[in-house]
């Protein structure tokens, strides 16, 4: 079977465009499975987005554009902010309404002690700098995993892995604290004990309305638990976010598979901004940030280095797909217990 392929540009920090590729579902296969479903036209170039003022009546230019940023964070918080800000400004210049940053966008420390030392409260200088950046650029920011000193810091001396969503005015509109902590031992990758420095969040966050659609917040290891994504989808999410820092062993084996599975089972767009490359002598990340559509097709991706990729979110396509494949109407919660029930 031959997939229709269209070209799209990805952008590196050197500002020299690199030609990448995105795939769309086979037109004939989709038409056969879902008669009447409007499918993306094959072999249509994904050109550089026009400024909003120049947009014409063509539907493709009316779809919201999102940017997925990929970075290599280090313990140097100031340099990390400079790198992220450069990508966010580039995303704004290209017309994105929302930019996604990965888990640990603020820093990647060498050990738990350094993690605790570098952490800040939500109202600290770093988040303040990003609120100013959001206002300056006029776009929403998904800050994928901030090392947050919570209100219980003095008692616990532990932090939260906090996903912060800022609107274009720089206001914090939602926070989600990672509920599934990554305490694992992967052969060839070494042990990881996130709980040495981090507390699990107490609850999920209801999906948030944004210019791109209703977003459900999650972080990295959360993607391994489909109950979370199903709960967010049943609560109205149209876009699921998994900002991450996947390792070099689990990345090639599981990264794309898990993201596509979450998209297919929830019929949501999935946006996954990722860390990449070597952060320091003790840690490296897989990269390959991507956007997956509700059919499970990767519609945009970065490679291994720092940069960004762009995707348009087509909610009418999402709604048509849900109409033709109404899986949520066919669910049997009477058999599953509380598994995947909507958020209260």
Language model region names:
Residues 59-72:
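Short beta-strand segments enriched in small/hydrophobic residues
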Residues 123-151, 266, 270-274:
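A short, hydrophobic beta-strand-centered structural micro-motif
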Residues 143-145, 161-165, 206-207, 289-291, ...:
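Short beta-strand scaffold segments in enzyme catalytic cores
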Residues 66-69, 80, 88-118, 134, ...:
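Active-site beta-strand/loop signature of hydrolases that rely on acidic residues for catalysis
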Residues 2-6, 58, 271-344:
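C-terminal beta-strand edge segments of enzyme domains
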Residues 110-112, 247-253, 281:
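Glycine/threonine-rich flexible loop motifs
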Residues 122, 128, 132, 149-235, ...:
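Active-site catalytic loop in hydrolytic enzyme cores
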Residues 1-34:
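N-terminal chloroplast transit peptides
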């Amino acid at each position: 079977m031959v997939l229709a392929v269209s070209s799209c540009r990805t952008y590196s920090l050197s500002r020299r465009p690199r030609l990448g590729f995105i795939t769309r579902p086979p037109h004939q296969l989709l038409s056969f499975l879902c008669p009447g479903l409007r499918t993306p036209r094959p072999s249509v170039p994904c050109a550089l987005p026009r400024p909003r003022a120049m947009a014409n009546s063509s539907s493709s230019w009316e779809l919201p554009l999102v940017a997925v940023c990929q970075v290599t964070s280090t313990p140097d918080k100031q340099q990390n902010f400079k790198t992220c800000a450069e990508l966010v400004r580039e995303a704004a210049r290209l017309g994105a309404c929302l930019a996604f940053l990965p888990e640990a966008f603020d820093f990647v420390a060498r050990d738990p002690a350094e993690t605790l030392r570098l952490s800040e409260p939500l109202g600290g200088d770093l988040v303040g700098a990003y609120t100013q950046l959001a206002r300056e650029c006029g776009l929403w920011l998904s800050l994928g995993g901030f090392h947050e000193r919570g209100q219980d810091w003095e008692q616990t001396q532990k932090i939260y892995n906090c996903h912060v969503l800022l609107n274009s005015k720089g206001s914090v509109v939602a926070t989600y604290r990672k509920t599934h902590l990554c305490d694992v031992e992967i052969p060839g990758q070494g042990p990881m004990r996130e709980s040495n420095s981090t507390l699990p969040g107490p609850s999920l966050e209801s999906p948030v309305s944004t210019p791109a659609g209703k977003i459900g917040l999650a972080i990295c290891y959360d993607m391994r638990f489909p109950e979370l994504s199903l709960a967010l989808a049943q609560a109205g999410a149209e876009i699921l976010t998994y900002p991450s820092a996947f390792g070099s062993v689990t990345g090639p084996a599981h990264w794309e598979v898990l993201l596509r599975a979450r998209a297919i089972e929830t019929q949501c767009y999935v946006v996954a901004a990722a860390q990449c490359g070597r952060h320091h002598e003790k840690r490296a990340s897989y990269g390959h940030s991507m956007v997956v559509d509700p059919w499970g097709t990767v519609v945009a991706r970065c490679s291994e280095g720092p940069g960004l990729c762009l995707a348009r979110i087509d909610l009418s396509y999402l709604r048509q797909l849900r109409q033709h494949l109404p899986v949520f109407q066919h669910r049997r919660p009477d058999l599953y217990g509380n598994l995947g029930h909507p958020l209260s």
